Amino acid sequence: MSEKFEYGTGRRKTATARTRIYAGSGGITVNGRSFENYFPRKTLQMIIRQPLVLAKLADKLDVRVNVAGGGVTGQAEAVRHGISRALLLVDPALRPVLKKAGFLTRDARKKERKKYGLRAARARYQYSKR
């Protein structure tokens, strides 16, 4: 496989996406499957396409992604982050556009841990006065 590609890593919650961008015709492959097959929800497909559409490169580049961990939404947002980072290597002039859209920022929000003595991270057990 001697095709030239640009590489980007994206993360969200516990999901990690390793993204490769090739010159091509607009195909997106996730874990060896078409991304419409891997992410059947239209909202997730839209999230993944956002950086390519914003950069007006949706039909000029092929994307191959390996994604692991997390749930479907976290994985889709990790893929978006990875594609955005790889696009910077394709064309550094895209930085202000992608940054303004918030695609280059790693969303650091994670699930807060459950604390002892509580029912969940912050929720208490029901209190009965009598």
Swiss-Prot record:
PROSITE patterns: RIBOSOMAL_S9. It comes from the Bacteria. The keyword Ribonucleoprotein applies. Pfam families: Ribosomal_S9. One of its GO terms (molecular function) is structural constituent of ribosome. One of its GO terms (cellular component) is small ribosomal subunit. InterPro entries: Ribosomal_Su5_D2-typ_SF, Ribosomal_uS9, Ribosomal_uS9_bac/plastid, Ribosomal_uS9_CS, Ribsml_uS5_D2-typ_fold_subgr. Signal peptide: none annotated. The keyword Ribonucleoprotein applies. Keywords: Ribonucleoprotein, Ribosomal protein. One of its GO terms (biological process) is translation. Belongs to the universal ribosomal protein uS9 family. This is Small ribosomal subunit protein uS9. It comes from Desulfovibrio desulfuricans (strain ATCC 27774 / DSM 6949 / MB). The lineage of its organism: Bacteria, Pseudomonadati, Thermodesulfobacteriota, Desulfovibrionia, Desulfovibrionales. The gene is rpsI.
